[in-house]
Amino acid sequence: IMLVGQTGNMGGYAVADVLTAKTIPSGKLTDTWARSYEDYPSSATFSHRDGNLDDEYYSDGIYVGYRYFDTFGVMPLYCFGYGKSYTEFEIKTMNVTADEKQVQVEVEVTNIGDKYPGKEVVQVYYSAPDGIMEKPTQELAGFAKTKLLAPGEKDVVTITFATTDMASFDAYDAAWIM
């Protein structure tokens, strides 16, 4: 499946380049595709279902998109961050450092295919420990794309994010909690 949106007057050329392997796809989905419309948590309350055409009330809370599917074990058709290429990659975590200000993840990516060059997107997620605050199973912390890698070639990417990005606001205590 290749999703092609409103590409403009040069879009056909770009699609042809991907289909003929002149350009190798490396994009990732920015949302989750459910197997069924009913798998989306707000599907029952959309106005065309409940008759309220003036207002929409979402009950998703913090569980929007992939956070809902991951946390409640709903198997999507295509996951957030899913993407295909004409080649394959091996991803190895080389180093992780963390202090009170930031987390840094260093990853080595190798094109293990034997025919096509390609780029890969490395995604870093974190999970909060169980606690009194409601939290999704995992959240995206950051991502990075490699340079164009020939078969057998390696690249090291570094994803850095603020430690405070993992905090949540606790309204009861009026404080940021990790």
Outline where the language-model segments fall.
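Beta-strand elements of well-folded, non-transmembrane domains
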Residues: 109-113, 128-130, 163-165
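Intrinsically disordered, low-complexity Pro/Gly/Ser/Thr-rich segments with frequent PxxP/GP/PP motifs
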Residues: 132-173
